[in-house]
Amino acid sequence: MGERVCQRTATELSSYPTELEAHVTLTDQRRIRIRALHSREERPMRVLHARLSPRTRYLRFLSPIPTLPDALVRRLACVDYRRRLAVVAEDEAAGCAGVVALASFSAVDETTAEVAVVVQDDWQRQGVGTALVSTLLDAAEKRGFDRFVASIAADNWIIRRLLDRFGRVVTSHTSLGVSELVFVRR
């Protein structure tokens, strides 16, 4: 499925969204650069995943994944900038080697997108997640998505609070420690 899903036309691949690029000063005065993940750009995801604590990995993937399987990395890196988009935050001091967070959306249907976000532990609670989710949801809305779905650990109050800032939950279902949230932008 991974290879077939990632076959893109030249037009899709040439439509890299430079308008998503931004520089942000965080609450601790560190600076990040936000940009879209390039199609098939796998390395930042692997580097970021290796830097995450086991708890943060669990909260993101709802499973203790010590290393990202190749098939999952290929699927996550398969972006077309319309129905699948990912944005990363880079530590400006470290450049491209310093990816500290990633947020993504993937179309569920024509108006609904599934969203996910992860921030490296030592960069959490500084505004990185807020900046990335804001960029991601703005981009999704410009592409016609007005409803969002997120699967989160039921005890992940940090991401729940972050999503509450950006939207109003219209449905929520929790089972076996996982909450499925459907929300719309405020």
Model-derived regions, located:
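Long, contiguous binding/interaction regions
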Residues: 2-186
